[in-house]
């Protein structure tokens, strides 16, 4: 079926079930950023393939809301479908809540699959629409009902993460969380975020593409841990090891019945922003719910010393692979046929040669020329274009290693660049360097520091429409909270930067139909000196790959900025050159020369 035919089928199904408006978010049952094939209902109905967005279908309209990363991509993919693009955050563009409030009236019904909407979101919708006399219907997966040949739920093998990689045993982690439960006065802790469960139990899987997680739910009490997952994914030795630490396996879907048995005198701690609305609605009404952040959130984000040291190793190996790739590109562009897709395959080949490499940490963004202006462009056979010895190639890629997860962006100068292109290339690089060199008092958040990355562009009256940085998991999700860099203050989204947190530093500049630039390093937060003013903090770059000096205008940089770049490049050469052959080493020596 075409997109128009799918929407028509969905509208007919809505009429049958008495639903006037149907909401289709991106989420799976666990609030994951990226989802398995089974959960891609929004993509199936709309044809939009971006990782963020919400569709709304009514009898007389169809709309898609997405953020600035995907404006260009969404406009292209929605063309001719009859779906209206709502550009989130733009002037005069209503939020999806504002649109629903205005367009749903007395007696109408809003529907969605309650397993794909958080309890907090559902409560907000119910409160807002109740004022209009609008009801909610949350027990129907209407989009799934009409999905022909829908993929099955993933069930990839589960493995244990050895303590030499994790740095802390499962038993010790569970003891820590139980102490936190005790402090909160909680009798039960409901955990449904897949990366949190994987971190807590020191297990990894493959149920989401590029995300080594296991489809599961978890309930912890003072005496037992119930893990709800598909038993077929677990080998006997893994099950026995889990049972030894008090973890008992139950069928994946059985949690929805289990939570109905919670007693009224018990206090249940869960995060309504993370747990889906159907699960929470199944908890007896007289049970007291403590709505708080997951107790695993901060311990997971603040990597322990073993994890940090392992990450340094992973980034050196990854740096060697990406450096080899850049050398190969520079040497061969214009001499042999190379396209965006074949370049991505070549980079995967270089990574695969590295010890302990597992997989990409996300689908690679290899964007040439004007494609780089699309912030999260993914090449397809239909969009793939050849690389030429001119302009910029933006390569935003990453890998999973046993030692951790990487995420790096380099803008590679493929041939002669204009003075204007170099001006913006240098401005973005200055932002990356200045943020990476920040020294700040403990208690600062990413909001306090974000201006360091944007200032060079703001001075030019320019900006970029994405966050400056995100947290990164340890052999887990490449996007991890709560740490981030952004200038907008978001309630509940401004975590203090703690020792061990790994965060990306990735300002950019994008000119539609022109070019795109992004420079990204991962960095770990560390303690610096302590004085009478308090504990000072700093960052250490983990990423070890040269920035392309062919795009840099030294005269546009301060002496301090040039020194920062030179010092970084000296580190890159020292750590990466031992992994290169003589030709590559000679090239790297020039690529990291002092300016």
Model-inferred region functions:
Residues 1-595:
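Active-site neighborhoods and metal-handling regions in enzymes and metal-associated proteins
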């Amino acid at each position: 079926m075409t997109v128009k035919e799918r929407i028509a089928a969905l509208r007919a199904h809505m009429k049958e079930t008495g639903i006037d408006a149907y909401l289709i978010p991106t989420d799976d049952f666990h609030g994951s950023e990226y989802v398995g094939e089974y959960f891609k209902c929004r993509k199936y109905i709309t044809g939009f393939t971006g990782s963020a967005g919400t569709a709304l279908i009514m009898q007389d309209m169809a709309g898609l809301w997405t953020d600035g990363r995907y404006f260009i991509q969404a406009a292209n993919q929605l063309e001719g479908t009859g779906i209206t693009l709502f550009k989130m955050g733009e002037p005069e563009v209503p939020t999806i809540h504002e649109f629903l409030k205005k367009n749903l009236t007395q007696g109408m019904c809003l529907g969605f699959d309650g397993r794909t909407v958080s309890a907090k979101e559902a409560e907000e919708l119910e409160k807002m629409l109740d004022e209009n006399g609008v009801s909610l219907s949350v027990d129907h997966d209407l989009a799934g009902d009409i999905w022909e040949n829908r993929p099955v739920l993933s069930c990839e093998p589960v493995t244990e993460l050895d303590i030499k990689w994790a740095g802390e045993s499962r038993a010790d982690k569970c003891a820590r969380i139980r102490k936190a439960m005790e402090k909160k006065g909680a009798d039960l802790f409901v955990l449904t975020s897949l990366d949190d469960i994987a971190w807590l139990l020191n297990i990894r899987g493959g149920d989401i593409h590029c995300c080594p997680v296991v489809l599961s739910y978890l309930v912890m009490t003072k005496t037992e841990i119930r893990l709800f997952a598909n038993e077929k994914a677990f080998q006997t030795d893994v099950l026995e090891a889990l049972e030894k630490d008090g973890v008992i396996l139950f069928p994946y879907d059985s949690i929805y019945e289990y939570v109905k048995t919670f007693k009224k005198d018990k206090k249940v701690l869960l995060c309504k922003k993370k747990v889906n609305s159907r699960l929470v609605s199944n908890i007896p009404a007289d049970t007291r719910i403590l709505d708080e952040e997951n107790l695993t959130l901060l311990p997971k984000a603040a990597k322990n010393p073993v994890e940090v040291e392992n990450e340094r190793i992973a980034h050196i190996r990854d740096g060697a692979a990406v450096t080899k790739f850049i050398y190969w590109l520079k040497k061969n562009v214009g001499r042999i046929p190379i396209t965006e897709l074949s370049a991505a395959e070549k980079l995967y080949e270089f990574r695969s040669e590295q010890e302990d490499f597992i997989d990409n940490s996300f689908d690679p963004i290899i964007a040439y020329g004007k494609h780089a202006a699309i912030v999260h462009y993914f090449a397809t056979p239909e969009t793939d274009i050849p690389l030429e010895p001119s302009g910029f190639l933006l390569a935003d890629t990453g890998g999973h290693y046993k030692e951790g997860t990487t995420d790096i962006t380099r803008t590679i100068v493929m041939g002669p660049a204009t003075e204007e292109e170099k001006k913006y290339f240098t401005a973005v690089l200055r932002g990356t360097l200045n943020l990476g060199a920040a020294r700040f008092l403990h208690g600062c958040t990413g909001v306090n520091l974000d201006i360091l990355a944007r200032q060079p562009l703001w001075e030019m009256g320019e900006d970029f429409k994405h966050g400056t940085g995100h947290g990164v998991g340890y052999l887990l999700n490449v996007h991890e909270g709560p740490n981030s860099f952004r200038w907008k203050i978001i309630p509940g989204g401004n975590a203090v930067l703690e020792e061990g947190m790994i965060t990306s530093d990735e300002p950019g500049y994008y000119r539609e139909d022109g070019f795109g630039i992004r420079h990204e390093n991962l960095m770990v937060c560390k303690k610096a000196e302590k004085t009478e003013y308090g504990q000072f903090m700093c960052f250490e770059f983990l990423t070890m790959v040269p920035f392309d000096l062919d795009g840099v205008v030294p005269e546009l940089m301060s002496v301090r900025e040039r020194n920062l770049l030179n010092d970084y490049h000296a580190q890159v050469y020292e750590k990466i050159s031992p992994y290169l052959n003589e030709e590559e080493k000679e090239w790297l020596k020039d690529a990291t020369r002092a300016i």
